[in-house]
Amino acid sequence: QSAPARAAEPDVPEGWTISKVVVLASSGVRAPTHFEEQLQSMELGRTWKEWGVGAGELTQRGAGLIQAMWMPLGIELRKLGMFPASGCPDPADVYVRSDTLQRTSALLDGIAPECRLGYRVSGEEKDPLFHALREGWCPITSAASAAAQVIASLPQGSLDGLTESLGPSFDLLNGLLRPVNKEMCERYSFPNCHVDEMPSSVTVSPTGNRVVITGGLGMASGFSELFIMEYSQGPEDW
């Protein structure tokens, strides 16, 4: 059994001390928010995972993984003298800001188990930290022009070129999905289609606060994220 991964030793100049640590983290293993319904509707002859929680909610395994990820940081902070060697840190020394309570609780259980540390959960409010683009706090300037420049830099200068360059990945995805269900194919006038056969496009909202890739690339991205979540969640007996 391999030893658990450790954080790199900080490079602190002689005579200096670390006064603050800021960590930015994304979500853990959660139930899907997109493409789950489409996946379940496909007649693929296989049973897909039952998550046992609502869309976007952290699973039990996801909570355990978050705790395991943050526990080494708590140990490292004690070694650095930022947390006491034993017992709980001062609540004034730790602050967590999150968009969901579930991930916040799992994080705190990992970094300082059984300690009552401060946090803030934004919930449904418009929080510029988590949804700056969507809520218009940070609109994209010349979004259409920027999207065109990105597309021009792709293989063959097009989304079709990008799809072609990802051929092996699409072959793997097509093997999992087989032909996509008829309703999806009919949107693109195909009687029986695979994901990579659907034309892709980039759409920019008039307000410049949303850029969406639709078609084959968009679907492939969504399904791939879903499969990553399923793989991370593991078998039912984990």
What are these model-predicted stretches?
Residues 1-238:
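Long, internal stretches of domain cores in catalytic or enzyme-like folds
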